[in-house]
Amino acid sequence: MSMSMGVRGLALRSVSKTLFSQGVRCPSMVIGARYMSSTPEKQTDPKAKANSIINAIPGNNILTKTGVLGTSAAAVIYAISNELYVINDESILLLTFLGFTGLVAKYLAPAYKDFADARMKKVSDVLNASRNKHVEAVKDRIDSVSQLQNVAETTKVLFDVSKETVELESEAFELKQKVELAHEAKAVLDSWVRYEASLRQLEQRQLAKSVISRVQSELGNPKFQEKVLQQSISEIEQLLSKLK
């Protein structure tokens, strides 16, 4: 039983090594094809690449990172040897997905970073422009308000002018009332004078009419006619006597 388990473990190790080597070769082939299809890039220093891989391992110093790496490798070997973890199709898919994700992260992350930086720069420019416009608007408002710093004196002068205007309007109204009153009094006096003149004319007409009627009545009286005749004869006789 132990021999069969050992054989099975060796078989699993060989299969895992084969799959791992195939999985490693596939990304290398993809990278090689990309390298051949595109312009040659500057090769990175192996030491710098190794340092970047080491820095990616969690830990504060080299001992901690080495312990984490060794523990992880021992755990993987132990899990595979004791059939706690069996490499199957899902594992291959997982490794392929992780390799593809790594490639995407390596080649698309810079482009996305550039896009994000450009977007952030655009938003930052818009915000800065809005802030500058707001600052200019505030400065213009401050300038417009500073021009009204003498508003108290101006208001006082305007109040004095309005007070003087009200006084002049009051005097003009009083003069207008006086003029209208004088016109009314003159109109009343004129009407009274016309009334008195009409009364005098009426009295004169009545007096003349009464005198004329009395004279006419006296002339129609025979005694008065005889008296007038006698008086006329006597006057004529006196004139004749004077002529002789």
UniProtKB/Swiss-Prot annotation:
UniProt function note: Mitochondrial membrane ATP synthase (F(1)F(0) ATP synthase or Complex V) produces ATP from ADP in the presence of a proton gradient across the membrane which is generated by electron transport complexes of the respiratory chain. F-type ATPases consist of two structural domains, F(1) - containing the extramembraneous catalytic core, and F(0) - containing the membrane proton channel, linked together by a central stalk and a peripheral stalk. During catalysis, ATP synthesis in the catalytic domain of F(1) is coupled via a rotary mechanism of the central stalk subunits to proton translocation.
Molecular-function annotations in GO: proton transmembrane transporter activity
Highest taxon in the source lineage: Eukaryota
Subunit structure: F-type ATPases have 2 components, CF(1) - the catalytic core - and CF(0) - the membrane proton channel. In yeast, the dimeric form of ATP synthase consists of 17 polypeptides: alpha, beta, gamma, delta, epsilon, 4 (B), 5 (OSCP), 6 (A), 8, 9 (C), d, E (Tim11), f, g, h, i/j and k.
Listed name of the protein: ATP synthase subunit 4, mitochondrial
UniProt GO BP: protein-containing complex assembly; proton motive force-driven ATP synthesis
UniProt source species: Saccharomyces cerevisiae (strain ATCC 204508 / S288c) (Baker's yeast)
Transit peptide: 1-35
Keyword annotations from UniProtKB, A to Z: CF(0), Hydrogen ion transport, Ion transport, Membrane, Mitochondrion, Mitochondrion inner membrane, Phosphoprotein, Transit peptide, Transport
Compartment(s) where it occurs, according to its Swiss-Prot or TrEMBL record: Mitochondrion; Mitochondrion inner membrane
InterPro entries recorded: ATP_synth_Bsub_B/MI25, ATP_synth_F0_suB
Modification sites for Phosphoserine: S144
The encoding gene: ATP4
Pfam family, one: Mt_ATP-synt_B
Miscellaneous notes: Present with 12900 molecules/cell in log phase SD medium.
Family: Belongs to the eukaryotic ATPase B chain family.
UniProt GO cellular component terms: mitochondrial inner membrane; mitochondrion; proton-transporting ATP synthase complex
